[in-house]
Amino acid sequence: MAKLTVRDLNVRGKRVFVRVDYNVPLEERDGQMVITDDTRIRETLPTLRLLVEQGGRLILASHLGRPKGKREPSMSLRPVAARLADLLGRPVAFVDDCIGPKVEQTAAALKDGDILLLENVRFYPEEEQNDPAFAEKLAALAEVYVNDAFGSAHRAHASTEGVARVIARRGGPCAAGLLMERELKFLGEELENPARPFVVILGGAKVSDKIKVIDRLLEKADTLLIGGAMAYTFRLAQGYQTGKSLVEPDKVDVARAALDKAAARKVQFLLPVDDVVATPVETGQVDKKGRPVIAYQNPRVNTDPNCPPDAAGLDIGPATVKAYSDVIARARTILWNGPMGLFENPQFAAGTNAIAHAVAQATQTRGALSIIGGGDSVKAVNKAGLASQVTFMSTGGGASLEFLEGRELPGVAALSDKPSSGGSGS
């Protein structure tokens, strides 16, 4: 069932609770927290402008980081309010809490077209607990609910699900924002009956992260192209040696079942024909997250399906790039989720970069519909400077994966269904 969207609403004179995803990267400079990438703020502007033009009184809510249910000044949304005001060219009020008398008074004083940004909802543990009383307090601020935070829609939290349920119970409309609407369109409707050939490119580290997606897409796709470390679990399932590559021995049966399903359904299931391997060496150092830093020596192209015993596979090789690019060039629908190798390291970024160019070229020259399914694939396309040359880039990480698995996302399920006979929706 299609969901109600902001286009269906009549919000003039009404207070609208808008859940956005302003979980932006911040860093400290001269004692101030500075936003280093405002993409997530920019992505909400069409929804906010539409609601402002329609005379809504906007109350924006978001999380930022993981403050673990307590006030953490470095994760305040105050800098976001200032940046949003700059981008919109109009004032954005900020209140240093998200519930309580001060918030209620500020919300009550809003006039048509005004915007108020609440403080980080995760400063309260009740947000992630989806606490009913906390959801009631947030919902008391507004008469209409809009969710434009697809990246958080897979979490049943107070601001993503609880508030919508309360407002709906009171008879208020709960709608998808324009960004959410696009996510549901491209990850949902467009993949239900895709133009063929439908080519799915899957990468990343673990088969366990993607197996449900693989299983579902084997029922829809014509070809699956596999890259990243997950390819080595499939190689192990085929009886090859994987050296020091990242593998999941406990997922070999799952990988074998996927290969069998592909064969039974006559889906082309392509694994790398060559790879870039290198010898991992411990440096004795740790990164910011306390993980050991590994250096890689003697990077080289390996054309043997077996990985050398002292080496790890870290990227797809040139013959694989050529084979995959040829398949992509003929595609009419392309879904890409996950990099082809350890692309954060320039030594092993060539495969991912080449696939990004192949997807962009198919989109531009053949008119293919290309969907970049969130997370690292989006980073890779941005890094290659090709964001404007693909059809759609998802803002979700875990949300995109869960949606592609066919799971109902709590934040989407809580939205009102579009009335089948038309109507204003409010």
Predicted stretch roles:
Residues 1-426:
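Active-site loop-to-helix "anion-binding N-cap" substructures in soluble metabolic enzymes
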